[in-house]
Every structure is written in C-alpha cells, then in structure tokens.
Amino acid sequence: MIPNRSGRLACSGQLTCSGIRRVRILGLAALACWLPLLGCGRSGDRADRSGTGVTRLAVIPKGTSHEFWKSVHYGAVQAADEIGDVEIIWRGPVVESDTGSQIEVVKNMITRGVDGIILAPNQKGGLVDAVDEAITEGIPVVIFDSGLDEGPEIVSYVATDNYRGGQMAAEQMARAIGEKGEVILLRYLPGSESTEQREEGFLAGLSEYPEITVVSSDQYAGDNATSAKEKVDQLLQIHGDSLAGIFAVCEPNANGTLEALRNAGLTGQVKLIAFDPSDALIEALRDGDCSGIVLQDPVQMGYQSVKTMMAALNGEPTEPFVSTGEYVATPENMDEPRIRELLQPKLKD
C-alpha cells in the first residue's frame, strides 16, 4: 500500500486493485498504531484457547441470506483448509439490518473464547462497543467488507475500495446514457459504511459529467428486493417519463430495481447499473436489461481475512488495509474468464 498525492492509500497492483483513491474505515489515521498491537500480545505462537490444537475463528457477516456472504464463507473455509487446524465458526444475522442480533453474535463469540473474530459490521457505529469488548478480552479483530467507526485497534481492514467502485458505476452509467440525462441513486441503509462509500463515489463520479442530473439521491431501499421494488415503483411514478438511469448500490436493491423496471416496461429505456451480481442480474446483463454490474471478489475477501488473522496470531506482519479489488462487468466483457468467475463466484453450501 502506498499513499497517493491526496494522502489516501493507493494500491500498486493492477489485477487486485484498480487504484485506491479513497479508503474509509474512519479510523484510518490510526492505522500506524495497529501493527505493534497485532496478535494482542500473542507474538510468535498461534492462539489456541480451546486447548485442542485447533485455532477457532468466528467469521461474522452482515447477514446470511444473500449469495455474496456464501462466497465469503467459501473463501474463509478455503483459507482455513490450506492452513490446517483452523476451524471457521460462521454465524450472523439472517437479515443485514439486524444490528442487535449481530452484536449478540459477537458477544457470544467472546463468551466462547474464540481465538479471533472476523467481522463485517452492518452498522459502522453500532458494533464499536462490541469490538472494543473483544479486544479488551484479548481477542484480535479483523474487519472486512464494511468499515467501522474510529476507536477499536483492529488488526486489519479487508475490503473492496467501495468509493472507487461507486466512481466506476458512475463512469459506466455515463457511457450507457451517452453522458447526459436524469438518473437516480438508490441508497441502501443509513450507517452501512460500504454502501455509503459507493454512494459518495457515484455522486463524485457523476460530477464530471455536467449534462447528467441526479434527480433523486435521498431514498433508501432497505435490505431486500421487495422493499427496493416498492421504492423504485414510487420513484418511477415521479420520474419515469424522463429517467435515463438508476444505480442500485447492492444486490437486493438491484434485484428489486430490475423487477420494477420490467413491470413498468422500462428495461432498456432506463439503464440499470448494479453493484454485486445475482442470477437475475447476470441474465439481464446478457439480455441488455442491465448495462453494467460493479463486481467485488467475495471469495478473496473471506480468504484474505482468514490469512490476515492467522498471520497476526502467529506474530507475522500484516497490512492495515487489504484490497480485494473492484471490476465492472458489461454485456461486452461478461464472458471473459476473470469477469465470468466474479459474476458467479463459488458458494459455501
């Protein structure tokens, strides 16, 4: 990781990172303080609180319903199998808006005395106290997918550069609509750091196109396709006749948006840019009903999170931020091997 001229972190790789222009875990200024604290005093020896010779890592996603998290799970188990004598304890709330349940999962893992916690916080502020409690109890924490408010001295942050992903969505939207027209930004949930970064990046990216107007950027679609469809139905009643495009910042939002556009007979006319794939969105991309999907690498997210945690537990140096890359699938490139792999990543049953 190297700083760019703006003081943000940048990635020197081509394939794994498309250029980190902005990283927000909100405690980024404190990153230099994290490395001396890695492993929480267990330098040189793998942790094993159970006394069985097996290192137990709790991997806690935002939710367990969407395919994205099943791919993260696959990557985490893949890393554990490679290392050996590592048990992945996969627990999380069913729905991504259930912060209370996620806090309870973290507290339960603290009580169980796991050797490390790997967490995707569904609220950047709501999980701070629980993470602090884990660290106080000597359990190191890796944050993945979505950032945490400043405070806890975590091991590392493993994620997509979501701000850059939002910019890439803006660039693809501009191409799809000929750099002019009215567009909608469909938000997710307040307090979700990853999607907030996508939203901010998208708006910043569109500022480069003076003939594109954002007619709605304050509507939250929620954490499921049904609520997203209902929200888009309402927006189409207001803006449908003149609308050129919609950016949906996550898989359930995009699925609901696609359904609403189809029901209104507006697919193809209103360009859809999605973030994260699903079977329905992949089919829509091939049929021309979706103009682009910003892709993450959830398998690598799970894999690198476990690898980073194990390095810390073994007293090895780790990076404060690990980028897992961001990409854009289009109708033109969707059959390229790397894009095809990211459109349909492997899942843990």
Language-model features, listed with the residues they occupy:
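Bacterial N-terminal signal peptides that target proteins for export
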Residues: I2-G27
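Bacterial N-terminal signal peptides
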Residues: L26-L37
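Short, isolated positions within intrinsically disordered regulatory regions of eukaryotic proteins
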Residues: C11, R21, L35-L38, G44, ...
